[in-house]
Amino acid sequence: MLRFVVLSLTLMVFINSSNFPKTAATPPGTYQNHTTYVKTACNSTTYPTMCYNCLSSYSSTIKSDPIKLCTTSLNLNVKSAKNATLVVSNLLQKAKAAKSHEVSILKDCVDEMKDTIDELKQAVAEMKYVRGGGKTTEEHLKNVKTWVSSALTDEGTCTDGFEEGRVNVETKKKVKKAISELSKTTSNTLALLTHYLSY
């Protein structure tokens, strides 16, 4: 079920991308209030309140720069992925200690989450080359979006085993909550990249 939600989130981001202005072309002086800029940017995401709550405290750093906006979102996304991975890893350790049949399912999920972290880090690294426009910049931006899309897919894959296998209800609840929150964050990051960076 969560995998369907993740795929739906990805589709929504790209379908709705044509409905929002490409802010990269907007002169920096257009937004005098940096907090307002962040709020406006977050309104282009699927979960605007979550987006604003995450990014508003960084508005003085982001200012009115779409690249700083997306880079900040990506860095926070990496942090969220690490936190979600920690939740699943702790459950895995408990399952191992109890010699539970859930071990293999949780291990697969942790592996997917590690891939998610790596992909988001790759996106952060690639963002360093997204500046100035032109064909090369466009290619780097495409790579960033690909890494983030892959991360979103892996987050959904993480929970596949919980749908197919026998898992403790409480364990499933904790994992789904952690991954669901992460998927929303990643969806927002992808939306910001899609709506606010275009060359």
Swiss-Prot record:
Which residues are modified by glycosylation?
N16, N33, N43, N83
Source organism superkingdom: Eukaryota
Tissue specificity field? Expressed in outer cell layer of roots, particularly in the root-hair zone. Expressed in roots and siliques.
Query: Which pairs of positions does the record mark as disulfide bonds?
Result: C42-C51, C109-C158
Query: Signal peptide span per the entry?
Result: 1-25
- Supply the CDD domains for this chain: PMEI-like_3
InterPro entries in UniProt: Invertase/methylesterase_inhib (IPR035513), Pectinesterase_inhib_dom (IPR006501), PME_Inhibitor (IPR051955)
What keywords are annotated for this sequence in UniProt?
Apoplast, Disulfide bond, Glycoprotein, Secreted, Signal
GO terms assigned for molecular function? pectinesterase inhibitor activity
| Compartments where located | Secreted, Extracellular space, Apoplast
User: Which GO terms fall under biological process for this protein?
Assistant: regulation of root development
Write out the GO cellular component annotations.
apoplast; plant-type cell wall
The text of the family note is: Belongs to the PMEI family.
Assembly description: Binds reversibly to PME3 to inhibit its activity; the stability of the PME3-PMEI4 complex and the inhibition of the pectin methylesterase (PME) activity is pH-dependent, based on protonation status of amino-acids at the complex interface.
Quote the function comment for this protein: Pectin methylesterase (PME) inhibitor that can target the root-expressed PME17 and PME3 in a pH-dependent manner, mainly in slightly acidic conditions (pH 6.3 and 5.0) but not at pH 7.5; this processus relies on changes in the protonation of amino acids involved in intermolecular and intramolecular interactions. Regulate de-methylesterification of pectins in roots and affects root growth.
Q: What is this protein called?
A: Pectinesterase inhibitor 4
- What species is given as this protein's source? Arabidopsis thaliana (Mouse-ear cress)
